[in-house]
């Protein structure tokens, strides 16, 4: 570059900055940005469809908004006033409805709270450039908000101007809309970047609300979880993934998500189940956590039959992938042919177990993995429904566009489950298309194959292999998302002996306190071991039994703390979140969240406690990944200035 061997590139840059003055101004702007405080990052994991606590934690920035209100109004507002202001920022529309019913002098209330919101907004926007704040402003009020943010209300020369704006907003009956706009702007400015470290989907009631919220969020990235990849595979047309998704939904009485939210017709499955399992009580398939106020006995009976029907279909479909892909090394998971159908037993590892359920009306004992003609028709109908669900396709496309298997960002390595290892602490390898992959290369290969599975032409070999890989990522021993040797689905349904249910974790989990392992992973992913951290979820932290989410002297942080209600008996909490601001890292542990309605009607907040993971000298933008990009831009602009001044490129005035 110094020898101007890349004049072509500089000529292109000159179109954007056609004069010395323009290039100089941009250099000054970029240098100034480098000295601003680093924006706040917010980390969440393992949401499992639990939309209410997710929405609340997103709105409160894991306590960041409450802290900002305390900083601004510590000595000027009473605790009850701070609490009321906090609720207004979180839930402006709902809070306004209550205020309008109860407040006698609404114009006075408007005036007081508009001043408070402007002061708070001024505080949270102070770490950003005017340009960045301007881009975040709601279009309807952008000019007015910008004026108010940059005018001090105690400036005597402008006091009348400032007050005039507020009074006019109230007078023309735009105060409600303005309060909503300011509140949402504050929420947006408090968090600069959101990281979702997997498992948006699972057994929770409304993963769709979570995804719709994320689609509209200003800055987000996603690291796929094992449940996410399962739904992604289903949306891509993998019938085994479809069967798994339906089985889990039936198991947890969550078929409403499939039928009502994603518009997938389950009547063919219900009809099939009633026909073929009519005289089967399906006792081992009664759904868990059924709310008797929502489901009658006949509905539970139907779901149980659907549950069993799709489970048997799943086992048959898995055979097709396992035989098609010998490199998956999963023949040992084919169990339907190991059953002794005459006495209802199965022999595993030389031990014979009696089956809990001995009724198999759709299995041909001479060819147990063969789909019946009715099963084939059903699977085809379900596949068409999943592929043609517009809402599901929109959500899965978003997961591909904003997601990946892992992310390196500001010296943090983010992934959902694990980096597959061997017992000797070396990277576990897998052969794909005759080539061996391990470590970062394995995850990169998985990522690209999953994308081929979704985006390739239907019927192509690339499409088929890609969707098979998505199923493997759900259940395979080398999957960074699954993180175990085997998924014992059959054993959990059909064998009472719980020793057969155990799923052996990848050795990665035994080494999470090993600095040697963490450093090896950092080097593999091109990160500096002295400055980097691993942040992941997937395995609930058993806080109530004394497990610490901060491992390996702070080099590894696990933030699966129990957003999913099913895991709270293990964790003793209702979730961990993490924030990383200019002062360092804070781990926040959350108690169970009652409801959004309770939050705005009673001004309750989720009870949380904060633990400082790492305190830093104040980090600036220049210390971040964005800072590195800006420094490269500055370097190029300085070269452009040289080219202008040496006459190698002409200014265009």
From Swiss-Prot:
Check the UniProt entry and state the signal peptide residues, or none. Answer: none
From the UniProt record, give the pathway where this protein acts.
Answer: Carbohydrate biosynthesis; gluconeogenesis
Tell me which domain of life the UniProt entry assigns to the organism this sequence originates from.
Bacteria
Q: Name one GO molecular function term.
A: fructose 1,6-bisphosphate 1-phosphatase activity
Top enzyme category: hydrolase
Please give the start and end residues of each transmembrane region. Answer: none
The answer to whether UniProt assigns keyword Manganese to this entry is yes
Q: What is its EC number?
A: 3.1.3.11
A single GO BP? gluconeogenesis
The record's annotation in InterPro entries points to: FBPtase_class3, Metallo-depent_PP-like
Reaction catalysed?
Answer: beta-D-fructose 1,6-bisphosphate + H2O = beta-D-fructose 6-phosphate + phosphate
Q: Which family does it belong to?
A: Belongs to the FBPase class 3 family.
Can you name this protein? Fructose-1,6-bisphosphatase class 3 2
Organism, as annotated: Clostridium beijerinckii (strain ATCC 51743 / NCIMB 8052) (Clostridium acetobutylicum)
Encoded by which gene?
fbp2
């Amino acid at each position: 570059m110094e020898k101007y061997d890349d004049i072509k590139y500089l000529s292109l840059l000159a179109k954007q900055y056609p004069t010395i003055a323009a290039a100089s101004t941009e250099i000054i702007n970029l240098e100034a940005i480098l000295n601003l405080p680093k924006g706040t990052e917010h980390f969440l994991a393992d949401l499992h469809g639990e939309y209410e606590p997710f929405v609340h934690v997103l709105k409160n920035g894991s306590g960041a908004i409450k802290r900002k209100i305390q900083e601004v109004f510590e000595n000027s507002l009473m605790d009850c006033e701070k609490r009321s202001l906090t609720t207004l920022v979180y839930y402006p529309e709902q809070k306004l409805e209550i205020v309008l019913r109860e407040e006698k002098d609404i114009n006075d209330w408007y005036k007081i709270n508009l001043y408070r919101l402007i002061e708070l907004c001024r505080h949270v926007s102070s770490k950003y450039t005017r340009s960045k704040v301007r881009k975040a402003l709601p279009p309807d009020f952008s000019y007015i908000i910008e004026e108010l943010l940059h005018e001090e209300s105690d400036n005597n020369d402008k006091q009348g101007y400032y007050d005039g704006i507020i009074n006019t907003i109230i007078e023309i009956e735009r105060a409600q809309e303005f309060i909503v706009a300011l509140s949402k702007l504050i929420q947006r400015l408090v968090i600069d970047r959101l990281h979702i470290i997997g498992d948006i989907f699972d057994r929770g009631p409304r993963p769709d609300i979570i995804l719709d919220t994320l689609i509209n969020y200003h800055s987000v990235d996603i690291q796929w979880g094992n449940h996410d990849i399962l739904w992604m595979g289903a949306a891509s047309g993998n019938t085994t993934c479809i069967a798994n998704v339906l089985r889990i939904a039936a198991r947890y009485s969550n078929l409403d998500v499939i039928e009502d939210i994603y518009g997938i017709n389950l009547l063919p499955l219900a009809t099939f189940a009633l026909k073929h399992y009519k005289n089967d009580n399906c006792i081992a398939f009664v759904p868990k956590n059924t709310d008797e106020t929502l489901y009658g006995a006949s509905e539970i009976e139907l779901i149980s039959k659907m549950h069993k029907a799709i489970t048997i279909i799943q086992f048959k479909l898995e055979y097709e992938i396992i035989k098609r892909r010998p490199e998956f090394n999963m023949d040992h998971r084919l169990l339907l042919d190991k059953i002794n159908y005459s006495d209802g037993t199965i022999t595993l590892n030389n031990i014979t177990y009696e089956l809990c359920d001995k009724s198999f009306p759709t299995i041909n004992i001479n060819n147990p993995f063969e789909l019946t003609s009715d099963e084939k028709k059903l699977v085809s109908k379900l596949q068409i429904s999943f592929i043609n669900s517009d809402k599901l396709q929109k959500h899965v496309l978003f997961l591909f566009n904003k997601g990946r298997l892992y992310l390196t960002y500001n010296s943090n390595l983010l992934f959902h489950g694990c980096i597959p290892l061997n017992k000797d602490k070396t990277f576990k390898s897998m052969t794909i298309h005759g080539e061996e992959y391990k470590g970062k290369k394995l995850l990169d290969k998985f990522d690209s194959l999953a994308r081929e599975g979704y985006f390739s032409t239907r019927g192509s070999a690339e499409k088929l292999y890609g969707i098979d890989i998505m199923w493997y990522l759900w259940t395979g021993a080398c999957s960074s998302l699954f993180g175990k040797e085997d998924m014992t689905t059959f054993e959990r349904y059909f064998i009472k002996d719980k020793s057969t249910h155990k799923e052996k974790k990848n050795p990665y989990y035994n080494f999470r306190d090993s600095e040697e392992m963490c450093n090896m992973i950092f080097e593999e992913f091109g990160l500096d071991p002295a400055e980097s951290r691993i942040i992941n979820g997937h395995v609930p932290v058993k806080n109530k039994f004394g497990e610490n989410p901060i491992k390996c002297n702070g080099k590894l942080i696990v933030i699966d703390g129990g957003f999913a209600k099913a895991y709270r008996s293990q964790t003793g909490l209702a979730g961990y979140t993490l924030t990383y601001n200019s002062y360092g890292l804070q781990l926040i542990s959350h108690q169970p969240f009652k409801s959004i309605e309770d939050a705005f009607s009673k001004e309750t907040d989720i009870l949380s406690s904060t633990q400082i993971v790492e305190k830093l000298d104040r980090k600036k933008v220049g210390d971040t990944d964005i800072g590195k990009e800006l420094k490269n831009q500055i370097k190029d602009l300085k070269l452009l200035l040289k080219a202008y001044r040496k006459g190698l490129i002409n200014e265009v005035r």
